[in-house]
């Protein structure tokens, strides 16, 4: 969200297998028909002119979880897996060796819910709003449309850029 709303997307998609087998849970071993692309590569253009590339895939035999890299004019930041809410950042620049920035945050998965509850109680807009969620779904639907048509697709929705949590924000702080 800190990059702001997405204006348009382009994408390609593919499906390598017509059926898949559920790998875990109560339905493990059950085969099902694949009805959507299982690999999507997308280009996103933000309203402010920035861009991003994304790959979403179930087609790799390599088991891993996501990672995030942000490249800017001075270097690249490699973030740890956002699914675990912990880990170190690594900053790469052209003029020096990579620098590891040790994580100081340990807010975890409940951060958004805690922030929502505090915002409701304070009567202020929440950061992870329904409008933001709708915009994310609109982006994903636009990616699928772009992959299907082979054309750039305008993302119809927009959303205000959410403010970052303030320095020192503590989800465990007693606020009642």
What does each of the following model-derived ranges do?
Residues 1-51, 57-62, 131:
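Rossmann-like dinucleotide-binding domain that binds NAD(P)(H)
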Residues 103-113:
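Active-site loop of classical SDR/Rossmann-like NAD(P)-dependent oxidoreductases
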Residues 68, 84-94:
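Short polybasic amphipathic segments
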Residues 118-176:
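C-terminal helix-rich "cap/oligomerization" subdomain common to oxidoreductases
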Residues 57, 82, 158:
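Surface loops and adjacent helix of pleckstrin homology
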Residues 66, 112-116, 120:
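Hydrophobic alpha-helical segments typical of transmembrane helices
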